[in-house]
Amino acid sequence: MTNRDDELAVLTRGLDQASTLLGSVGDHDLTSPTPCHEWTTAELVDHLVAAPAKFAQMVRGEEVDWSGPTPHVGDERAGAFRAGADELVEAWHGVGDGDAPMGPDWQSAEIAVHTYDLAAAIGHPTGELDPEVAERGLVFMKANLTPENRGPVFQPEQPAPEAADAYQRIAAFAGRTVTPSR
């Protein structure tokens, strides 16, 4: 297996677990706050659902508009996410080495951070998630996300609790305030 194959295998697992987590979101969860202070759970869900299809566009070398409003997906959140996730994995299988702007670890980082956000918002223990997704994402973020290029999306790194799991560590690096697990 090549490094990209390893990255894609981890991304696929991250997409699978995010899909499962999205399937557990109930209507009663949608107004809950998230670690992304500017988003409710409904807004986070919409962003998370839209991300894989946009990543697939990037992998294929297409122009992506991240600034536009994200459409609301309603009750079809897990199915819509799964369709985008499948499109993303297919896009990766269709490009040669070096033809994409970055490898799958970048998308694993994004998926891991927002999986943390969603898990925290709905009370799902992050210790039950696949740690390798967050660990690979964190390695990628530490190598590529500097204080100078964080922009408005990522706040400055926050301290992680002493016994933080992989998702808490990546969330803290991405600027989320993380509390110790219970």
Label the predicted regions.
Residues T2-D6, V10, G14-Q17, S24-H37, ...:
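Structured surface interface patches that mediate subunit assembly and partner/cofactor docking
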Residues L44:
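Extended, alpha-helix-rich binding/interface surfaces that flank or overlap catalytic cores
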Residues L48:
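Glycine-rich loop at the start of a catalytic domain that most often binds anionic cofactors/ligands
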